[in-house]
Amino acid sequence: MKKHPSSPAACPCGKPRAYPDCCGRWHAGALFLQAPDAESLMRSRYSAFVLDQLDYLLQTWHPDTRPSELEPNAADVKWLGLQIKASQQQDDTHATVEFVARLRQAGRATRLHELSRFVKEEQRWYYVDGDIR
């Protein structure tokens, strides 16, 4: 089920901008799927996870590694924040982003620490895969 923040709430990605002016512009509208760099795509994907925007997640996942489907968040999942540890562009079409995403599920806090790989094809950035840290 797609969720959108009500009113101009802060973007889930943690940047000090309203969602429509931050990740929301990559999720819908004229700039749909047009994140300009790997870090912006990473932030927009985190926001999409928070908001259960599964179609966006699938469309920004590289076709070679994309799962056939994704499950929405369990009812007891609450995303708590995103921290970008490092963002590095190797060349014009390859980049990595290291991040820590914090969440709580069934009352238990957990962290996902990943080094993600991204590739740019036909003027679009895609998530390829990542190594859990």
Curated annotation (Swiss-Prot):
Origin superkingdom: Bacteria
Signal sequence bounds: none
Pfam family, one: YchJ_M-like
SUPFAM superfamilies named in the record: NTF2-like
Family: Belongs to the UPF0225 family.
HAMAP family: UPF0225
Protein name: UPF0225 protein BB3385
Lineage: Bacteria, Pseudomonadati, Pseudomonadota, Betaproteobacteria, Burkholderiales
